[in-house]
Amino acid sequence: MTAQLHMMSDKHDQDNDASVLLQTRPRTKRPPLYKVLLLNDDYTPMEFVVHVLERFFGMNHAQAFEIMLTVHKKGVAVVGVFSHEIAETKVSLVMDFARRHQHPLQCTMEKED
């Protein structure tokens, strides 16, 4: 909490004592952030993963291709860091989109350290 100190004097204060007024303002805490992760599988086409990254995470083709290769080689990649609600929505959108296109692509989220 931050505090501001204000000195106040009273005209009628015979002893010239100063009154102290302490105002506190609560410091708001930033909400926790969550990493959205894309997981590799042996069946989802690479082109589909690139399309998902462009469509749901606003990446250009080169960025999406680079992340897709990371997912392919390492098995997982962070595709973005968001507030809880946004991360949850992105995971849901990606999973629904993959399911509609009959791909087993997995997308998860975890709290950022």
Curated annotation (Swiss-Prot):
Top-rank lineage group of the source organism: Bacteria
Region (Disordered): 1-24
GO BP terms: protein catabolic process; proteolysis
UniProt signal peptide: none
HAMAP family per UniProt: ClpS
Membership in a protein family: Belongs to the ClpS family.
Physiological role: Involved in the modulation of the specificity of the ClpAP-mediated ATP-dependent protein degradation.
NCBIfam families assigned to the protein according to its UniProt record, in alphabetical order: PRK00033.1-2, PRK00033.1-5
Subunit details: Binds to the N-terminal domain of the chaperone ClpA.
Protein's name in the database: ATP-dependent Clp protease adapter protein ClpS
